[in-house]
Amino acid sequence: MSVDQTRLQMAVGVTASPAPERLHALDAVRGFALLLGIVLHATLSFIPAPTRIWIIQDNHPSMTLAVLFFVIHVFRMTTFFLIAGFFAHLSFHRRGGRVFIKDRLQRIALPLVVGWPIVFAAMVPVVFWAANFPNGGRVPGAPGWPPVLPRFPLTHLWFLYVLLEFYAATLVLRTGMAWLDKSGDIRAQVDRLIGLTMRSPLAPAILAVPIGIAFNLDPTWFGWLGVRTPDQSLVTNLQAVVGFGTAFGFGWLLHRQIDLIRVLERRWLLNLVLAIGLIAASFVLASVPWPRPDAVRFAGATCYALAIWTTTFAVIGVALRFLSGFSATQRYIADASYWLYLIHLPIVMALQVAVSSLDWPWPAKFATILLVAVPVMFGSYQLLVRYSVIGAVLNGHRIRKPSEAAELIRTQS
């Protein structure tokens, strides 16, 4: 490495990594988080509840799927935003600010602006269809449209809107920091603080403090809510800003010292064991009636906040430990996951309505929803997206290789 290259890395705060293949694991985690979102939304019609919480309530509810929802909801989006912040810092310093902004507008803003009307329009007939079922609720009245701003039904695409907010905030903060900290002393202190935090066994507890406080400031919070989803307003709620913003910012700063991710790899088993215990405790605190609700709410909020970060670290650590090498199949799934997540909700909702009144056991219904939806969506990605303009917008230009299909078959055999 030349002296100029070394100086450049020091200037941007990025240390050389002897194992760049680790980024394959992080890319896999990002795709995994999006695919888990499909599973999570597929569980919603089966969750036992005294009142309908989703477009349709299946006639065969399942506590097992309710537990699956709870577990996924604990860590999925915090993990996603941490990885998003990590890769945002990588992209910013690899491409420069101007290209980074152009790239984010193409890959995040354009899918939101173009995709939202299409997805929302596809959801409307499903809502009308569901209204014909006794357990499908009623069609929203005309006075509810258009929504009165800032209320706005962002649907599951809220994560794109929040990402754009975080990109903008980060660029403003970075510009201000570069102006205030010309010597780099403040950034060096921040790097040291991040390093001390990551190396400490209390790292999940330290990072859990902001979202734990946000939970406790909300008198209506309870464990099944988790971080309140900011899907119904253009003003992102406090819990989402604090919880997901902490994750995004930490991911951005973590990439400045990329070797720190090895700590997560070394502690994967410890974090996994702790995560299982904390999720179990959070579930009990959220589900069992207790004589002192205020005290239990505080305990539940604290436990849930710890579970968020311990599970996030566990999932990333497991991926770093077992998925660091390149895999064509793994890369294909990671690339496809973005498209699948963008389009999945109307498809999943329609299938939920279709099976809701059938006299099938819930495992058969749940499996049917996923086994129909997922292959259809993967097929649409391969045939309509991967080598098309849509694929270029979402994942960058891709040249079809004659050997690609053969390689996929080889890796799966």
Which role fits each region the language model picked out?
Residues 2-413:
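Alpha-helical transmembrane segments and their immediate juxtamembrane cytosolic regions
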